[in-house]
Amino acid sequence: MIVEQINDGNFQEKVMEHSKNTPVLVDFWAEWCGPCKQIGPVLEEISDEMKDQVIIAKHNIDQEPNTPTKYGIKGIPTMLLFKGGELKATKVGATTKSNIISWIKENI
């Protein structure tokens, strides 16, 4: 499964609405962020492995700054997990694949 790119304009539909049926993990990132580049491929793997359990989406904070501001994103990478149309959990910083999977499973 491909990681979906989202923006301020489609955040409501792609994240809030979809999370009512399937949890959505949003990775807030930027091109210049080294740790963001490290977890990008990891999130793609997780997207494939957990495609029936969670949708993985990416939001570029430099190109689309309104949504990160709304959710108080101060450092990246930051991952927000939405379920049932609401923010369920937050994880800040790069970490291992197994830690991300455990975090997802704990919160879905």
Q: Where would I find each of the regions flagged by the language model?
A:
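Thiol-based oxidoreductase modules, predominantly thioredoxin-like and allied folds used
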Residues: 5-7, 28, 39-65
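A short beta-strand-turn-helix
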Residues: 5-24
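Non-catalytic, surface beta->alpha helical segment in thiol-disulfide oxidoreductase systems
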Residues: 75, 80-108
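The canonical Cys-X-X-Cys-His
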Residues: 33-36, 79
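Short pre-active-site segment immediately N-terminal to redox-active cysteine/selenocysteine motifs
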Residues: 22, 29-32, 75
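N-proximal helix/coil linker or "cap" segments that precede and/or mark the start of modular domains
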Residues: 1-3
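Short loop/turn elements that flank and shape the SAM/SAH-binding pocket of Class I
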Residues: 12-14, 64-67
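Structural cue for short, hydrophobic secondary-structure segments
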Residues: 27-29, 81
